[in-house]
Swiss-Prot record:
This is Ubiquitin-conjugating enzyme E2 S. One of its GO terms (biological process) is exit from mitosis. One of its GO terms (molecular function) is ATP binding. PANTHER family: UBIQUITIN-CONJUGATING ENZYME E2. The lineage of its organism: Eukaryota, Metazoa, Ecdysozoa, Arthropoda, Hexapoda. The active site is at 98 (glycyl thioester intermediate). Pfam families: UQ_con. Belongs to the ubiquitin-conjugating enzyme family. Keywords: ATP-binding, Cell cycle, Cell division, Nucleotide-binding, Transferase, Ubl conjugation pathway. Catalyzes the covalent attachment of ubiquitin to other proteins. Acts as an essential factor of the anaphase promoting complex/cyclosome (APC/C), a cell cycle-regulated ubiquitin ligase that controls progression through mitosis. Acts by specifically elongating polyubiquitin chains initiated by the E2 enzyme vih/UbcH10 on APC/C substrates, enhancing the degradation of APC/C substrates by the proteasome and promoting mitotic exit. InterPro entries: Ub_conjugating_enzyme, UBQ-conjugat_E2_core, UBQ-conjugating_AS, UBQ-conjugating_enzyme/RWD. It comes from Drosophila willistoni.
Length: 208
């Protein structure tokens, strides 16, 4: 990422206040399926959890996204990334998101909430015409069932709620050893699930 990103000192006090106000409003009244994670020490580092929309291959997942504000925000759009691995036409290998709202359609008054809602909409209606992941874009257009199966498998492996929750904050010892015990059990269940999915994938590849 460019050095112009994630530098709170370069933002005007007015912009910082505006961003913090919007983040606090979203924390108090969250949009459906979106939970914002506030970093009070650096408002240029904005993260959120987005629930996979029902009726999509992402439905069972929770996806962590990151917005980094440039020094010229809001005159220039932020950069947006999926931190959770995802198989999607408009998401590059490094997680960068391609959406017109953050390119040619950007307007300074759109705000953080609008960006996060746009990203959620992208999970419902991908745009294969401007694909950053060409394989996913081609598969969506030509073999939708295969695309859906691949996207669902990636979601089951990488976007489980427990996995996202474990990355939102460092582990705390407040609840004593039982918390760690449950975390260990969760990891074993995840490993078993991952092993099962890999076996299913191998069986599918043999059929091709």
């Amino acid at each position: 990422m460019s050095s112009q990103y994630s530098n709170v000192e370069n933002l005007s006090p007015q912009t910082i206040r505006q961003v913090m106000r919007e983040l606090q409003e979203m924390e108090n009244t969250p949009p459906e399926g979106i939970k914002v994670l506030i970093n009070e020490s650096d408002v240029t580092d904005i993260q959120a959890l987005i629930d996979g929309p029902a009726g999509t291959p992402y439905a069972i997942g929770v996806f962590r996204v990151k917005l980094t504000l440039s020094k010229d925000f809001p005159q220039t759009p932020p950069k947006a990334y999926f931190l959770t691995k995802i198989f999607h036409p408009n998401v590059a290998a490094n997680g960068e998101i391609c959406v017109n709202t953050l390119k040619k359609d950007w307007k300074p008054d759109l705000g953080i909430k609008h960006i996060l809602l746009t990203i959620k909409c992208l999970l419902i209606v991908p745009n294969p015409e401007s694909a950053l992941n060409e394989e996913a874009g081609k598969m969506l257009l030509e073999r939708y069932d295969d695309y859906s199966q691949r996207a669902r498998m990636m979601t089951e492996i990488h976007a489980q709620p427990a996995k996202c929750a474990s990355t939102t904050s460092d582990a705390k010892d407040d609840d004593g050893p039982s918390t760690k015990k449950h975390a260990g059990l969760d990891k074993k269940l995840q490993d078993k699930k991952k092993e099962k999915l890999l076996k299913e994938k191998k069986r599918m590849l043999k059929r091709l």
